[in-house]
Amino acid sequence: MIFERRNPVASANSTVDLRGSGHSLINLSASSGSNHLIRFSLADGTLITGDFSIHFQSLSADFIIDLSSAKCLAFVAIETSFA
């Protein structure tokens, strides 16, 4: 897997956990009040995107994707704005 972070907030911490079941758990922790775009690029050319906001009450978010039928080529977390 290729893991990529573009323009993350200074305190961002991202981990990728590939599970034997074919699921990948993506965890990204960053400064509160920031918004992020998550993008997965799969081997078959499919792009999957998801947005989440990190609030003061919750400083991390998990994003789970089923990779049983496609290999994830890239994971990108992009800072989009500040709340």
Curated annotation (Swiss-Prot):
This is Putative protein p39. It comes from Acyrthosiphon pisum secondary endosymbiont phage 1 (Bacteriophage APSE-1). The lineage of its organism: Viruses, Duplodnaviria, Heunggongvirae, Uroviricota, Caudoviricetes.
